[in-house]
Amino acid sequence: MTIQDHTKRKIPRLSATRDCHEIWPTVQEHGAVIIKNLLPLEVVQRLNREVDPYVKIEPIPAAETKDHPNRVLSTTTRMINVLADFSKAYREDVLNNETLNKVSTDAFSVYGDYWVLMGAVMELAPTNPAQPLHRDMRFSHPLVDYLKHDAPPTSINLLIALTPFTVENGATHVILGSHKWPDLSGATMEQTVRAVMEPGDAVLITDNTVHCGGADMTGTETRRLLSLTMGISQITPLESNFTVPRPIIESLTPLAQRLVGWRSQRSSVPRDIGLLTIRGKSIENTLGLKSEQPLPDGMEKGSMQETDIGGQ
């Protein structure tokens, strides 16, 4: 395993608009890329406002009140997902983002359709410790370790900065070239480079890229990100959007509906018979699902009502 050539190069940086066609080839070569201005600042600001009340009241991921506690994340981490339920910015601006969908199409073309495996806003409190170096999907989808080492990735993760990412407040560590390693037994923190970013920038990695969240050294700064994991439709998502009210689902574009699992999916194989079908018919046709409909008054927050956030 050769690592010397990858130790201290900087993460490549590309424009979300001007360099869109170069993004996925760059990830294939280096294992990571920083996409500048993936989300406009105005979208970041709206997304932050919409998630603020929910992040503040969400129990820690490892809370024993949860049916499926997440003991991988630190106790100084707050995480809220199923964002389509209450965030208009997520529903309209993130899910329909042209660069996001171009990159996902490029990454998964050999497999077929893709969707969101999880979209979660994570807030890391001051003094949040560094994570261990790891590869994504290993705490939920062990099948990825049984794939051929040179198989195309089945998922990618975009860590989108919603607040500044600095070395001091814990910007993500990445080992360039590690997506080509057979394992991560030789990985060390000394081999990492940092994903320093402004709000709206994103670091894109594959499910084989070795990385970790950094430690906050400021003692005062809270760091927030949108962790957006995209994957092939042949893999079960980590989150379910079945509780999102139908009027909200019908306000989405057909693309966004597919990304949150409310439309049938297709693979790339010849004579594809479809995925998530109902006796050979699609979900959307069976349900008579509409799209891009105006939302009724009072439906912006879906199942997350005012009482759920203490009347805020």
From Swiss-Prot:
Keywords: Dioxygenase, Iron, Metal-binding, Oxidoreductase. Residues 287-312 are annotated as: Disordered. One of its GO terms (molecular function) is metal ion binding. Its cofactor is Fe cation. It catalyses: (-)-cyclopeptine + 2-oxoglutarate + O2 = (Z)-dehydrocyclopeptine + succinate + CO2 + H2O; (Z)-dehydrocyclopeptine + 2-oxoglutarate + O2 = (-)-cyclopenine + succinate + CO2; (-)-4'-methoxycyclopeptine + 2-oxoglutarate + O2 = (Z)-4'-methoxydehydrocyclopeptine + succinate + CO2 + H2O; (Z)-4'-methoxydehydrocyclopeptine + 2-oxoglutarate + O2 = (-)-4'-methoxycyclopenine + succinate + CO2. Fe cation binds at H134, D136, H211. One of its GO terms (biological process) is biosynthetic process. Its EC number is 1.14.11.-. Pathway: Secondary metabolite biosynthesis; Alkaloid biosynthesis; Mycotoxin biosynthesis. Iron/alpha-ketoglutarate-dependent dioxygenase; part of the gene cluster that mediates the biosynthesis of penigequinolones, potent insecticidal alkaloids that contain a highly modified 10-carbon prenyl group. The first stage is catalyzed by the nonribosomal peptide synthetase penN that condenses anthranilic acid and O-methyl-L-tyrosine to produce 4'-methoxycyclopeptin. Homodimer. Belongs to the PhyH family. This is Iron/alpha-ketoglutarate-dependent dioxygenase penM. It comes from Penicillium thymicola.
